């Protein structure tokens, strides 16, 4: 059968999948659907987990179906054309830098990606002797880069105020708002504000749902829903006064966990677009589609190179799982921007799995003084905001034990004497030290350093002969590869711990409105009960032990989130109460007595009176 693919790919990309069929979880946005590939993720061993998540990541590069093109994809003509148009707008700012600015903005993972990319492209410009033109905005400020503060993305006015501050006095500002599910009020407000002020601002919306699936419930402090904002942007795109970049990348391997594919696709799409703008700006030409495709293929190669190490990634997954099962801690110690990736992975486990901030933590080794907008925000804020080398040496190293795991993440271009000195100090406390090492063909890890690591994942990259801007491709590849490894390891470890039901994050922490609606959808999916009954049960658990009054029932979602984000096991408690028709107190007692959250829920699902299998439940209603 002849190939239906238009482009030559580095990796074997999947054919269109079951999730693209019109009737598959029809009421649910793509970014919240369950991925058919991983519907039995909770039953998989470490090797299978790595394989499945690798297949999900490959879906990022999948082309749209030729016979039944349901959704536009990363390689779709419409997406590539929009990428080129946005690259041209960025070039206009680069050519006339006085009064110009490129803002990358988002909440949670999207905001952390905005931070990482602004750091990278400012470094690129400094290396050329140019004035840096990038900045980032993250809901909740710099503290949200290194700690879990997802609730801050629920305010549109907060987003607008932050944008006004950084854009004051500027003449031309490209604002790239990132919201994986097209749902974050922080971004919606900024996009609307930009459209009201097109003399200065050009808004670019990046997400991975069709606009018809953007969130449409009211934003508490804004006049429009996210969908209305996105629809307005689509109309203004006809005059190139706004742009929407929203290719479908398929559901997450772990349902709704946008830190994974959503974060990776954000990085791939925007680094491709921005790097193409920089590579061609001095040539006086607009970026070409060929330039975009060349860069996209290097990211495909990163997938190929990374997942060629699947067996070693699985070994690390098992080791991290053992540490967490024994109530130990996992410390991810990364050099330069790989340290940012490590911090992101640790922080995102908190709300994703209901983890403690000490369970998996990232640390950045290297100078970070020029990275943050307001570094003072991070001083003396408490242990959950610590992330530097000094923090690791003073607060972690003295208390390391044999049940902890330390993972060193570095390249052979880093200061290897510094790596060795720190590794030797860690080895004095614990033998459980691992490494993720990036090298280029021809480089080798010095023997004295190699022997310090009982187990290591060594990823060797081919030599690339690029100009200066192009040399950043390898830096971006290594960051993406590190992200894929760490996301897979931390997700896999929590799967092995019994935190996942099928491919759903049953024990997530309800930290913002998006997660509130996701919690409700899970209750509907697994209980088979009405939306009204599930809301009632969810609110009862959130506000327990206080009885629900009509005033509480009628309160805005933000009020419920404010209470819920401090509580543990909200969703499993509500689900048990629904399935067993028992009190909240009894549900809590059953969970407390169980060795695994998901085991007690599985038992309830298969018990008397549960007539339908999990698969039989209909689609939940998502606003």
Curated annotation (Swiss-Prot):
Which GO BP terms sit in this record?
carbohydrate derivative metabolic process; intracellular glucose homeostasis; negative regulation of glucokinase activity; protein import into nucleus; protein localization to nucleus; response to fructose; response to glucose
Primary subcellular site in the record, as a coarse category: cytoplasm
What residues does beta-D-fructose 1-phosphate bind to?
109-110, 153, 179-181, 348
| Residues covered by region (Essential for interaction with GCK) | 463-465
Q: Name one GO cellular component term.
A: mitochondrion
- Region (Important for interaction with GCK), start-end ranges: 199-200
Q: What is the superkingdom listed in this entry's lineage? A: Eukaryota
- State the compartments where it is located: Cytoplasm; Nucleus; Mitochondrion
Q: Which InterPro entries match?
A: GKRP_SIS_2, Glucokinase_regulatory_CS, MURQ/GCKR, SIS_dom, SIS_dom_sf
Please indicate if the UniProt record lists Lipoprotein as a keyword. Answer: no
> A GO molecular-function term, please?
kinase binding
- Which residues are beta-D-fructose 6-phosphate-binding? 109-110, 179-181
Annotated ranges, domain SIS:
90-286, 320-476
| Loss of function: phenotype | Mice appear normal and are fertile. Their body weights do not differ significantly from the body weights of wild-type animals up to 60 weeks of age. Mice however show a substantial decrease in hepatic glucokinase (Gck) expression and enzymatic activity, with no change in basal blood glucose levels. However, following a glucose tolerance test, mice show impaired glucose clearance, possibly because they cannot recruit sufficient glucokinase due to the absence of a nuclear reserve.
PROSITE patterns named in the record: GCKR, SIS
Please tell me whether the keyword Glycoprotein is annotated for this protein: no
Q: Keywords on this record?
A: Carbohydrate metabolism, Cytoplasm, Mitochondrion, Nucleus, Repeat
What family is this protein classified in? Belongs to the GCKR family.
Q: How does it assemble?
A: Interacts (fructose 6-phosphate bound form) with GCK.
Function field: Regulates glucokinase (GCK) by forming an inactive complex with this enzyme. Acts by promoting GCK recruitment to the nucleus, possibly to provide a reserve of GCK that can be quickly released in the cytoplasm after a meal. The affinity of GCKR for GCK is modulated by fructose metabolites: GCKR with bound fructose 6-phosphate has increased affinity for GCK, while GCKR with bound fructose 1-phosphate has strongly decreased affinity for GCK and does not inhibit GCK activity.
UniProt comment concerning the protein's domains: Fructose 1-phosphate and fructose 6-phosphate compete for the same binding site.
Specify the protein name.
Glucokinase regulatory protein
């Amino acid at each position: 059968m002849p190939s239906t693919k238009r482009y030559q790919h580095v990796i074997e990309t999947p054919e269109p999948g079951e999730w693209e069929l019109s009737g598959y979880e029809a009421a649910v946005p793509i970014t919240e659907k369950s991925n058919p590939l991983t519907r039995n993720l909770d039953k998989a061993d470490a090797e299978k987990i790595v394989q499945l998540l690798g297949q999900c990541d490959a879906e990022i590069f999948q082309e749209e179906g030729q016979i039944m093109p349901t959704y536009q994809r990363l390689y779709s003509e419409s997406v590539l054309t929009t990428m080129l148009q946005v690259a041209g707008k960025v070039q206009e700012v680069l050519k006339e830098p006085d009064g110009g600015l490129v803002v990358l903005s988002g909440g949670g993972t999207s905001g952390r990606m905005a931070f990482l990319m602004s750091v990278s492209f400012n470094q690129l410009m400094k290396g050329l002797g140019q004035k840096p033109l990038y900045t980032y905005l993250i809901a909740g400020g710099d503290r949200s880069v290194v700690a879990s503060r997802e609730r801050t993305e629920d305010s549109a006015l907060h987003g607008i105020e932050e944008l006004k501050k950084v854009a004051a006095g500027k003449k031309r500002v490209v604002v790239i708002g990132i919201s994986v599910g097209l749902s974050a009020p922080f971004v919606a407000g900024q996009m609307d504000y930009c459209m009201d002020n097109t003399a200065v601002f050009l808004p670019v919306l990046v997400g991975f749902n069709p606009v018809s699936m953007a969130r449409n419930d009211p934003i508490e402090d804004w006049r429009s829903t996210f969908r209305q904002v996105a629809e307005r942007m689509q109309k203004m795109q006809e005059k190139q006064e706004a742009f929407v970049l929203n290719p479908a990348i398929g559901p997450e391997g772990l349902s709704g966990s946008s830190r994974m594919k959503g974060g990776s696709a954000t990085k791939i799409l925007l680094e491709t677009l921005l790097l193409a703008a920089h590579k061609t700006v001095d040539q006086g030409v607009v970026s070409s589609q060929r330039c975009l495709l060349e860069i996209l293929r290097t990211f495909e190669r990163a997938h190929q190179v990374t997942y060629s190490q699947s067996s070693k990634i699985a070994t690390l997954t098992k080791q991290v799982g053992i540490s967490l099962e024994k109530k130990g801690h996992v410390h991810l110690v990364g050099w330069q921007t790989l340290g940012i990736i490590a911090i992101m992975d640790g922080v995102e486990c908190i709300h994703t799995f209901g983890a403690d901030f000490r369970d998996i933590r990232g640390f950045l080794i290297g100078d970070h003084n020029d990275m943050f907008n307001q570094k003072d925000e991070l001083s003396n804020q408490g242990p959950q905001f610590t992330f530097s080398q000094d923090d690791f040496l003073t607060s972690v190293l003295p208390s390391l034990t044999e049940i902890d795991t330390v993972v060193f993440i570095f390249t052979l271009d880093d200061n290897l004497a510094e790596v060795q000195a720190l590794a030797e100090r860690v080895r004095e406390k614990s033998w459980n030290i691992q490494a993720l090492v990036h090298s280029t063909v021809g480089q080798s890890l010095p023997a004295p350093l190699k022997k310090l690591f009982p187990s290591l994942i060594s990823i060797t990259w081919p030599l690339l002969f690029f100009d200066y801007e192009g040399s950043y491709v390898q830096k971006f590849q290594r960051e993406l590869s590190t992200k894929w490894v760490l996301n897979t390891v931390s997700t896999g470890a929590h799967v092995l711990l019994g935190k996942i039901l099928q491919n759903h994050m049953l024990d997530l922490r309800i930290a913002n409105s998006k997660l509130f609606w996701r919690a409700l959808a899970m209750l509907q999916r697994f209980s088979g009960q009405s939306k009204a009954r599930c809301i009632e049960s969810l609110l009862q658990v959130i506000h327990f032990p206080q009885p629900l009054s009509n005033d509480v029932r009628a309160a805005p979602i933000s009020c419920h989130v404010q209470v819920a984000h401090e509580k543990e096991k909200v969703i499993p408690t509500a689900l048990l109460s629904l399935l067993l028709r028992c009190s909240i107190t009894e549900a809590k007692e059953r969970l407390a007595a169980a060795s695994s959250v998901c085991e007690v829920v599985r038992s309830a699902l298969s018990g008397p009176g549960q007539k339908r299998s999990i698969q039989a439940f209909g689609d939940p209603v998502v606003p």
